[in-house]
């Protein structure tokens, strides 16, 4: 998502990065409840994000596109490939476990080593959260595709079977038929979730609703590409 931000002269380098950045990396901590001033309870996901480090700045002249590469999470040198380790040594940065890129039209205003913290988002902002769904191994059609089971009485013997696969005339199973198989362990995006609270001191975001993945799983939080920002309650 491109930013149409115009650089003001009064902002510091960190503030400039915070203004243009639309992505931050972190991990899921779990779920809890928060109460509004009127007593309304909200189920929220607690996400620990940042501080992330700008590990590389891509420009139109050198790379053919404008983007910022972020790194998050410490990792031992021996667990990185030599090309990755060389990139960090050249930049003078500590190795990071996760790296992701975000395309920005004003990426050239950032430099390697700049930090991105959770206060790039404010209360009421809409975000898209990307995580890896929990792996559930082999699952049948009821759990995997929400099929209804068959009757359990009057001698019925196909309670959880998938049912007919195709007609006799076709003589084969059509590609794409929903059947049992591996379920989970896939990339999932939860869109247009509202930021309920920002705890900059502890690098925490409280996001309304559920987020894909297990606790301590790696996630990405970015500005929502669709949806309209909701108005704050008076």
Model-flagged regions — what are they?
Residues 5-234:
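Extended basic (Lys/Arg/His-rich) segments that typically form rRNA-contacting surfaces
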């Amino acid at each position: 998502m491109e930013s149409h931000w115009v650089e003001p002269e009064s902002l510091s380098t960190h503030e400039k990065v915070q203004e243009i950045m639309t992505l931050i990396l972190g991990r899921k901590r779990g779920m809890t409840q928060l109460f509004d001033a009127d007593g309304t309870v909200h189920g929220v996901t607690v996400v620990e994000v940042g501080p992330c480090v700008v590990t590389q700045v891509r420009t139109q002249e050198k790379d053919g596109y404008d983007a910022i590469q972020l790194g998050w999470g410490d990792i031992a040198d021996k667990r990185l490939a030599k090309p990755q380790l060389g990139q960090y040594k050249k930049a003078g940065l500590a190795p990071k476990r996760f790296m992701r890129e975000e395309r920005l039209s004003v990426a050239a205003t950032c430099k390697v080593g700049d930090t991105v913290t959770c206060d790039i988002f404010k209360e009421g902002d809409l975000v898209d959260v990307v995580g890896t769904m929990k792996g559930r191994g082999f699952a049948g059609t009821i759990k995997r595709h929400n099929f209804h089971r068959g009757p359990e009485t009057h001698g019925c013997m196909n309670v959880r079977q998938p049912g007919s696969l195709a007609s006799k005339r076709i003589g084969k199973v059509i590609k794409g038929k929903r059947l049992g198989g591996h379920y989970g362990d896939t990339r999932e995006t939860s869109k247009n979730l509202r930021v309920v609270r920002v705890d900059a001191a502890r690098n925490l975001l409280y996001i309304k609703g559920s987020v894909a993945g297990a606790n301590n799983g790696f996630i990405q939080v970015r500005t929502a590409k669709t949806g309209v920002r909701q108005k704050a309650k008076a």
